[in-house]
A protein has these predicted regions:
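Structural signature of hydrophobic alpha-helical transmembrane segments
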Residues: 2-18, 67-77, 129-143
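C-terminal ends of transmembrane helices
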Residues: 21-34, 82-95, 144-160
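Alpha-helical multi-pass membrane helix bundles of inner-membrane/thylakoid proteins
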Residues: 67, 82-110
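Hydrophobic alpha-helical transmembrane segments in multi-pass integral membrane proteins
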Residues: 49-55, 112-124, 171-185
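Selective transmembrane alpha-helices of multi-pass membrane proteins
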Residues: 9, 63-89, 158-185
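Hydrophobic/small/kink-forming positions within alpha-helical transmembrane segments
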Residues: 14, 44, 48-52, 56, ...
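Juxtamembrane transmembrane-helix termini in multi-pass membrane transport proteins
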Residues: 3-59, 123
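Short helical (or helix-break) motifs at transmembrane helix termini and adjacent helical loops
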Residues: 13-24, 84-87, 113-118
Length: 185
């Protein structure tokens, strides 16, 4: 596998985290560099961790994750998306400025489950996992931080409709993940 191939894989894996980061930026009252960094570290960290786990533990958990991973991602993203849509009708006092571990952990897990499967395939190809997972993590970190700022630019002017769209996007990502996992897509 070439470096170019790996970069394309990293960008592809980071798209869900990028979309969720945009949603976080949309729904925050005031976005700072700290918020962008938090999203980048959480999503980039999990996008680094999951391929490594898939590489080392894939034989033991691949079947289980293949069976339940899409459902887990769907439920987490659908619940968070529905909550965003609901909160968008509540006014500014309902804005989501929560970048705590409790808020970020389910998002990081939901957006990185597919990276576990990539790690399993990397093991089958006998790739050197640390540089590969590192590149995936760094690209996801950067794109996620950018996503928060992009979301904030639109959120300031179009907060309620943008938050509704963000919630719908999260639900659609969950549905896509589920349908892909079930072999429909």
């Amino acid at each position: 596998m070439t470096l170019f191939d790996l970069i394309l894989i990293a960008i592809s894996l980071s798209m869900d985290a990028f979309a969720v980061s945009i949603c976080k930026g949309l729904s925050a009252r005031k976005v700072s560099l700290q918020h962008a960094t938090i999203c980048g570290v959480w999503f980039g960290g999990f996008q680094f961790l999951m391929p490594a786990l898939g590489y080392f533990l894939g034989d033991r958990f691949a079947a289980l994750l293949t069976k339940f991973g899409p459902w887990i991602a769907f439920v987490l993203l659908a619940l968070i998306g529905a909550s965003m849509i609901k909160e968008s009708f509540g006014g500014d006092e309902q804005l989501d400025d929560d970048y705590s571990a409790k808020a970020m952990l389910p998002l990081a897990i939901a957006t990185s489950i597919d990276a576990f499967a990539v790690g399993v395939s990397f093991a089958a190809m006998q790739m050197d996992i640390l540089p590969a997972a590192g590149l995936i993590g760094v690209i996801t970190c950067l794109l996620s931080a950018i996503g928060v700022k992009v979301g904030a630019m639109f959120g300031d002017k179009y907060r309620a409709p943008a938050e509704r769209i963000g919630g719908i996007v999260l639900i659609l990502i969950g549905v896509k993940t589920l349908l892909t996992g079930l072999g429909v897509l």
